[in-house]
């Protein structure tokens, strides 16, 4: 029994067009997992496509007219504990199976999203709320549904440079230091740092890539370097 995993936090999203099966899905989640928190999130309609593309990154399902498919209205985010994760190929098979079941239940498309492993839960939470798994665990479970009306972090722009840096620092194995009147972000997860910052590329010096991010009404240069 020494191989028994510690319980881990996972995230399911029921997009607007899948919510006709919400009661059945949440009832099934309660049976299989331990419900930690449920959020109802709304994004501004004009930012929905941007938010979605950024949330999925390169993983936007192929040939999926994503926003038309998901619907651009309020969606449910269910955070659950799996008390006995079963890993295969870096993914928790319990979660993958449930996600596939719920996608079938909602008509076979991409109307339900789930994080495949703890790292993806963390990434999803950073984009949605600017918080890590640890941050949410420290806040503790809540019975009531939490209503959140806001876009992904840094959408359409960051409120301040400090907000952007504080958020990117939450990525594992990431450091921020002053560099050339700006900041250099060293990260093992450099691509995630770029996506989270919503940074657009300028040019690259070997090993260091210069980007810019939108802060208020200005563009701020920022450097990102991948470390191993």
Model-derived segments and their meaning:
Residues 32-35, 170-173, 202:
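A generic structural signal for alpha->beta connector loops
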């Amino acid at each position: 029994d020494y191989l028994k995993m510690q319980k881990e936090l996972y995230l399911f999203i029921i997009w607007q067009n899948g919510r006709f099966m919400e009661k059945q899905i949440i009832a099934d989640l309660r049976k299989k997992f331990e419900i930690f928190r449920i959020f109802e999130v709304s994004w501004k309609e004009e930012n929905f496509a941007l938010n979605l593309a950024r949330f999925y990154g390169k993983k936007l399902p192929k040939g999926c007219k994503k926003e038309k498919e998901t619907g651009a209205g309020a969606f449910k985010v269910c955070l659950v504990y799996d008390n006995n994760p079963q890993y295969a190929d870096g993914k928790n098979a319990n979660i993958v199976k449930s996600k596939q079941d719920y996608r079938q239940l909602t008509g076979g498309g991409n109307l339900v999203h789930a994080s495949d492993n703890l790292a993806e839960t963390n990434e999803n939470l950073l984009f949605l709320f600017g918080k890590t798994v640890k941050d949410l665990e420290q806040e503790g479970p809540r019975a009531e549904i939490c209503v959140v009306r806001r876009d992904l972090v840094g959408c359409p722009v960051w409120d301040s440079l400090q907000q952007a840096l504080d958020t990117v620092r939450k990525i594992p194995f990431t450091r921020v230091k002053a560099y050339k009147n700006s900041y250099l972000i060293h990260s093992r997860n450099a691509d995630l740092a770029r996506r989270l910052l919503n940074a657009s590329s300028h040019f690259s010096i070997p090993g260091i890539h210069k980007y810019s991010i939108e802060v208020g009404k200005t563009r701020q240069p920022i450097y990102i370097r991948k470390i191993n």
